[in-house]
Amino acid sequence: MFGIVVTTIYDGAFIDAYYEHFERYGRTAEVRFYVVGDLTTPEACAERVRAYTRWGLPWFFLTPDDQRAFLSDFPALAAEIPWRSDNRRNVGFLMAYRDGCDPIISIDDDNYPTPGWDFLGEHAVTGCDVTLPVAVGSDNWFNICSMMTVDCPPLGGGQTVYPRGFPYPRRTLACGTVSATAETGRVAVNAGLWSGDPDVDAATRIVTRCATREAFTQSYLLGRGVRSPINTQNTAVMRAALPAYYYVKMGVSLAGLKLDRFGDIFSGYFVQLCAEAVGHRVRVGSPVVEHRRTPHNLYVDLWHELAGMVVLDDMLPLLETPLTPATDYGTAALELADRIEAWAAGQNGFLWGEALQDYFRNVAANLRLWVAACRQLD
């Protein structure tokens, strides 16, 4: 059964849209829905979910008390999942893992299913062997926005943009290159795309005010060793990969900046490294959701993203170096934790000091706690 995980501090209007979509495609009996509440999530959201629960659907609103009870078996990890944070989705991931959901799908509360794409049907490729053209990009980086038609009114028409978390030193037009040769691989991660307001960084959004619509007719496998940002808006992972899919905690203060809005980006890169180590692949393309972005102050977003942009450039050697081949995701994730710790210890330069090195030591420690929790649930 599919498991969908989302966290929200809004009224949950998206929930009705997903129910109607699943009804249209005859899939309401195929999915468990985990809506992870936070301290400020309105009661209207809880009631929306519970209405479907009363109909007999396995749709769950997880109250703070529900989450505390579940995490009581993992006290060290519980202490590392902050309130008033989208990091709460980690609780839903673990619950879906406990319940045997496969695949486990992460969505954001401002992304809506679209009529032309069977949301669950397209994500059903996760865990399966597929044969598809290969996205090779340039210098082992692929720009998933090249699969979309992009309109940037201030720039006078269609342009190329790059997704949030795509390193600036790797941005070239050749990053949209796709090989004519097809390959076969098992899909560990299926990264669906988004129409409307694309997931680009605040700097791009301020300059371009871009909008997107899908322009692809076929999804792709990322080439071996090829990287691309993966967010939490519309992403499925096979259950076996969840020990490597820890949503990274944000919030450290650095030189007047705050490292934020990169938790999903770091987790997406980390699971890619682990999938490669296990011999699995990442598929990019369908399904497409509509991103109805909740109100944001773009200058605040930019302030939150600047530190991540700097750190990501420094992280390139870590992300571009394969892990040792592994038989399972937990083993790969533990090696990655060691590498993160060693990499951070050797960094210096802008933003790098004890606070940032301590932060990544904490990321590595939390990844180990995450693997241990998954193994405890097995």
Language-model features: locations:
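Catalytic beta-strand/loop signature of glycosyltransferases that borders the donor
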Residues: 107-108, 278-289
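Short aromatic/hydrophobic "clamp" motif used to bind/position activated sugar donors
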Residues: 104
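Acidic metal-phosphate-binding loop of nucleotide-sugar-dependent transferases
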Residues: 110-113
